[in-house]
Regions:
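Conserved catalytic cores of phosphodiester-cleaving nucleases, focusing on short active-site segments
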Residues: 49-75, 81, 87
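Arginine/glycine-rich "motif VI" loop of SF2 helicases in the C-terminal RecA-like domain
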Residues: 82-102
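Active-site metal-binding core of divalent-cation-utilizing nuclease and nuclease-like domains
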Residues: 32, 36-61, 128
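Acidic-basic catalytic patches of nuclease active cores, encompassing PD-(D/E)XK
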Residues: 1-40
Length: 128
């Protein structure tokens, strides 16, 4: 993935660049595991979803979280109840906007990147 030490973590531009870098890494990982990427960085008033994909019959809403090392904590823990609620509202909006049936099987996954390790957590939280 290359050197990352040029990033200054306090700068919002650099945080966005880091986020984009790890979302790209997540997309590559997901694609290798059979996911079809439909959309990246879907934004609306309700919030943002990092990646929207298909995994077999499922429409999957995916949050990507990164931490440099274990001293910063488990990246998956950053997807707290408030963040989950925002993702769910955004997912509902996405489905309404694109006329996706409520009967479509959906789930919410998290891609947790800790250093150079990528971990996929399928069905990380209830998707409704």
């Amino acid at each position: 993935m290359g050197e990352r030490n040029f990033h200054l973590h306090g700068n919002s531009f650099n945080r966005r660049a880091i986020g984009t870098e790890y979302e790209t890494l997540a997309c590559e990982y997901l694609t290798r595991h059979g996911y079809q990427i439909l959309c990246r960085n879907f934004r609306c008033r309700q919030g943002e979803i990092d990646i929207i994909a298909r995994d077999r019959d499922y429409l999957v809403f995916i949050e990507v979280k990164y931490r440099r090392d274990e001293h910063e904590g488990d990246p998956a823990e950053a997807v707290d109840a408030r963040k989950q609620a925002r993702i769910l509202r955004t997912a509902r909006y996405y489905m309404t906007r694109y006329h996706i049936s409520e009967d479509t099987p959906c789930r919410c996954d998290v891609v947790a990147v800790l250093g150079s390790n990528v971990r996929l957590i399928r069905d990380a939280f209830w998707c409704g």
